[in-house]
Amino acid sequence: MAMRIAALLFVIASTVFAQVPVAPSPGLAGEPLGTNVQNYNIVDSFETGYRFSTVGGSFEQYRSSVNFGDGIRLLGSSLMVNSKNGHGRLFDQFTLSTQGLGNDPYESAVMRVEKNRLYRYDMSWRRNDYFNPGLVTGGGDGQHLLDTQNRMQDHNLTLFPQSNLKVFAGFSTSSQTGPGYSSIQLFGATGNTFPLFSNVHRVWREYRLGNEFRVFGIRVNWMHGWEDFKDDTGATLAAAGVPVAMPGPLPAGLSSFQASDPNHGTNPYWRAAIFADRGLFHLNGRFTYSGGRNAFVVDERSQASSPARVQNVITSGNGDRPVATGNLNLSFTPTSKLTVANSTSVYNVRTLGNSYFAEFDSQTQATTVLFYRYLGIRTVANDTNLNYQVSHLWGFMGAYHYSERLITSQQQFTFAGATSSNPAEQSNQLRSGEAGVRLTPWKPLSVLLSAEIGTNSHPFTPIAGGDYHTLTGRVQYRAKTFRLAAAVKADYNANSVSLTSYAAQSRTYSVNGNWTPLSRFTIDAGFSRAHTYTIGGIAYFLDQQLFQGQSSIYLSNINSIYAGVRYTIRSRIDLYLGYTRVQDLGDGRAAANAGVGSAPALFQAVQTFPVAFQSPMARLSVKVNDKLRWNAGYQYYGYQQDFTSLLGYRANTGYTSLSFSF
């Protein structure tokens, strides 16, 4: 259930940024055509100002989803320098744009430098503050926390970018650093839980080199890369700073705890692609191979003084993970009305090596050992699609999809001196057909209807597609100043595996449109509703007793609405008003434990998750002169959970700034 709540919180957080934050301002200062300096034309705009925020309610929830604070910022900047005749001395184009510099939680910079026919260099840099207070654990009182920074950057150099012979070189890196808190239960299922502190340190780097050329009219592109990953995060007993105080004194003290779990890996890879166009025939193909190699060790040692007890857990492993993929796509267009396309793809991944797990308990004098040796997955798929435009009024399409997957694994288990091997193999075939029709009864009006039905002989997981069908429809009306579109999609899936069963249905309805009666006035709005209902069989142990024949149920009804109005007064004042609201109505119950079905009350309380988020905003931008604009904006963030009121928040944010051009 925590995964479902986390997924819903991700949707809410994504919606926060689906509506562009009120700052920076979209309007730029300066002359649109720029200023000429010697052989270059320069267009620049910089926006600097003060951002403010006040938060009521759960500050941790606000930080995990919005996180804007107070202070002076370089909210945004844009610089573009172009040579006037395409023959600059050192470069012909230079562009630089930034956002949020000066301690915003989301900072970025993008740069390009190009010299025609000689080189092109692209750079991007981002820094995100990642704050995760573990709000979905312990009813919001969990002892898990991450307060880290993610830094990412990419560098790409292309030599001879306009020629038939190109050379590529690149470098990328990302890192995550900062403090983290977690917890661990020691000395049995009834043992105490202890807080842990971790200094998170994860680094990923990639180096790449490639080339593109043409031979016999075929364009060939290849790339060779090397990836390196290191995670040196460990854990010690937390002495202070635990997010929530431990409930009550611990009956058995923990005198020491130390965990070391380095995880290092490399992944050299090759990528190749070909593209060919022969008039009626179009061909493209791609092939990738990566030879991942990884090694890890987890060494946990805990010692209790009362009663005296020592527990050691050691997990180690090393292995190779070669992955090969390939696809070949063919398209045939014998007439302007008919297109036939076929795609064949192959995916093969193998995990080879040993994973060793051992646990020793000084009180029970027991040792458990588990080996994991091999996992292989091979998938072959083929898709055939046909599109035919009968007339300007209507056309139709049809498709057939087939895939076959083979999964093999090998495990070895040692317990009390006895060793057993557990090989397993599974194969399944997925077949589906799709048909649709396109109608244009009137030039401004278009209609698209389609349906897909599929069956899987042996689904790999309970939630995978078994016997399913999908229905979709879309209608759009487009005029010169007005556009209105509506869509509907319904998915139904029934799956039964050897141990349990699973069924799901979802329906999505949406309508959106925009109207621009005048060049200075625009209205944009939309609404969508997503209904999801899932039910799956579950089996579990409670107090060493097996419970079966029960169901896990989840219901969701998410309504989303957005609207925006832009109005310009005398080409000097820009006004924008916007509103976004996302609400999951759940199943309408008044209390968390008023569930459905025969599952225990604990399960019924997590069958639905009613939550609401809204964010109105207003922004004003006034042109003072050709090189200066004054901006101000306000944005409200409101979030509430119906069954956990302590996790709601209300935030008033805003800014005032000056946009200027040199």
Protein language model regions, located:
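Gram-negative and organellar
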Residues: 19-38, 42, 51-662
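Bacterial N-terminal signal peptides
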Residues: 6-15
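Positively charged n-region of N-terminal signal peptides that target proteins for export
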Residues: 1-5
